[in-house]
Amino acid sequence: WSLPHLMTTVKHAPNWELPNTGQRVYNYPVIGVDNSNGAYAGTLYVVLYTWTGAYLQVQVIRSADGGTTWSKPVPVAPPSDTHDQFFPSLSVSPTGKVGVTWLDRRNDPNNIDYQAFAAISTDGGQTFPNTQLTQAFSNPDTNGTGDNWMGDYTGNTWAGPDFIAAWMDSSNGVDMQDVVGGIRLH
């Protein structure tokens, strides 16, 4: 093992809670590596969120030298002072595409309900064109347990050319349910 290297500094949400709700939003950085033979082979990627002082922002950092140095954070979604992004996940395809998923409240003017979003970078994590995965809204307080816990279980992976995502969803109005969706890449 090498000596630890500082990747980046993040701020957690006030009281570790999602604003406008009582839901906890712990920060679980997710790391991936480009194992392709492409232009960004060997690049390490980490997705996380940080508190900007006004909202939670999902960001990706990357290292092209085995983790010795790290890039400045790149926002995955368009910056805004009005909506939160949280519970990100990341994976790298066999061809070097960087896939990120997260929950996003950009389409709720009250910044409460969320939808699932994804972004796939084909330029080594420099840009992340966004794709909205769900049309219906989920309310983070609709969890059935009454204890301000919606689950923090999001994830994604690649199956050949397909990017597969899983997230918590309460758009049916009852307890949280895991939902799986796929984005076919052509």
Indicate residue ranges for each PLM-predicted region.
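Extracellular, repeat-based ectodomains that mediate carbohydrate processing or recognition
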Residues: 1-186
